[in-house]
């Protein structure tokens, strides 16, 4: 039966986002996800370094590097940080009246009093010393820690450019706390 008062529904064009715009949005989303994963990995991924007589946690992209420090056991670096490890044996420091069981603070004092250094000490506590150093036109922030074991004291220096201090100062402490002497 014909019903003149009923109007047929009007069909509109397809609703939704046009295909070209959707393609662009998917590409942007994929790029942001990939960038986010890379950023997260670079800033959080770690690995266990196998050093000479110790292990420690460090950034996943850090590699062994060379050094001019004659006393260095190991040197590691990436594009933003450096880690240097030195061991002072008990016999090395016995000549200066120090021995087994000294506090980290006493060993830091020994090093600072007897070493030739261009470091500007900015702080010291029972576990770490903090310093700045300028080499040429670059300014660096550093932190040193000491771990006793295996016949001596292992000194670890963690270094980055001063501009990256806030990014790394807590990470340096985490890495130092992860040291295990073998």
Predicted feature residues:
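N-terminal targeting sequences that direct proteins away from the cytosol to non-cytosolic compartments
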Residues: 1-78, 148-152, 159-182
């Amino acid at each position: 039966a014909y019903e003149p008062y009923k109007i047929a529904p009007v069909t509109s064009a397809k609703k939704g986002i046009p295909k070209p715009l959707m393609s662009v949005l998917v590409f942007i989303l994929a790029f942001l996800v990939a960038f986010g994963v890379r950023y997260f990995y670079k800033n959080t991924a770690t690995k266990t370094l196998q050093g000479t007589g110790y292990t420690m946690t460090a950034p996943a992209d850090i590699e062994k590097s060379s050094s001019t420090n004659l006393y260095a056991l190991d040197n590691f670096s990436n594009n933003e940080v450096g880690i240097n490890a030195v061991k002072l044996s008990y016999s090395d420091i016995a000549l200066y009246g120090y021995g087994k069981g000294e506090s980290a603070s006493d060993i830091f004092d020994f090093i600072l009093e007897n070493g030739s250094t261009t470091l500007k000490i900015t702080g010291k506590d029972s576990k770490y010393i903090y310093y700045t150093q300028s080499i040429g036109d670059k300014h660096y922030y550093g932190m040193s820690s000491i771990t006793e074991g295996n016949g001596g004291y292992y000194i670890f220096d963690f270094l980055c450019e001063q501009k990256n201090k806030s990014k790394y100062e807590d990470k340096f402490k985490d890495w130092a706390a992860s040291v295990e002497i073998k």
